[in-house]
């Protein structure tokens, strides 16, 4: 995963430093909203059956973005964004140990089981373990300031609740 991040950073830097274009890169948080992976039937079912564990201490920080906010930010960036790298995320980064149990509770499910990192590496691989235990959140301050963008769904808590209210089980 680290090599992939290095490659992404390299491409972002090359793009934003290109002399003949006003290159910009948008870094999106974890998408959520109707029809997204997080709220797809199989994922919700797995959460309800406690098949999505809390890995290690759940110390990974996640930033989320509602798909409607991502679309709005993209349109604004294309229309008036200057060169640079912009994080398109909500206002409330969250630790996995915070958002995963909260989502389970919103579904009326029991809290996720805890699984040690070593076991999760064997069962799910290093990538998932890193996401759940080491990921770092992004800040949307630059996107708000330079693009004039404001997420309509500023909190994942409220956004998750809204999506679940309109979703049919």
Feature locations, PLM:
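A conserved pocket-lining segment of Rossmann-fold NAD(P)-dependent short-chain dehydrogenase/reductase
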Residues: 43-65, 69
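Mid/C-terminal beta-alpha module of Rossmann-like enzyme folds, strongest
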Residues: 71-74, 79-127, 167-169
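Amphipathic terminal alpha-helices
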Residues: 154-169
């Amino acid at each position: 995963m680290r090599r992939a991040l290095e490659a992404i950073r390299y491409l972002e830097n090359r793009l934003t430093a290109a002399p003949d274009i006003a290159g910009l890169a948008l870094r999106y948080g974890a998408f959520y909203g109707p029809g997204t992976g997080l709220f797809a039937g199989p994922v919700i079912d797995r959460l309800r059956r406690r098949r999505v564990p809390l890995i290690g201490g759940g110390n990974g920080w996640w930033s989320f973005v509602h798909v409607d906010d991502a679309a709005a930010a993209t349109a604004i960036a294309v229309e008036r964004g200057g060169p640079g790298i912009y994080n398109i995320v909500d206002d409330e980064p969250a630790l996995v140990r915070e958002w995963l149990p909260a989502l389970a509770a919103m579904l009326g499910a029991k809290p996720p089981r805890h699984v040690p990192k070593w076991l999760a590496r064997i069962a799910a691989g290093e990538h998932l373990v890193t996401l759940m235990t080491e990921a770092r959140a992004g800040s949307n301050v630059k996107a708000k300031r330079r693009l004039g963008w404001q997420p309509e769904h500023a909190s994942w808590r409220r956004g998750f609740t809204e999506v679940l209210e309109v979703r049919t089980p």
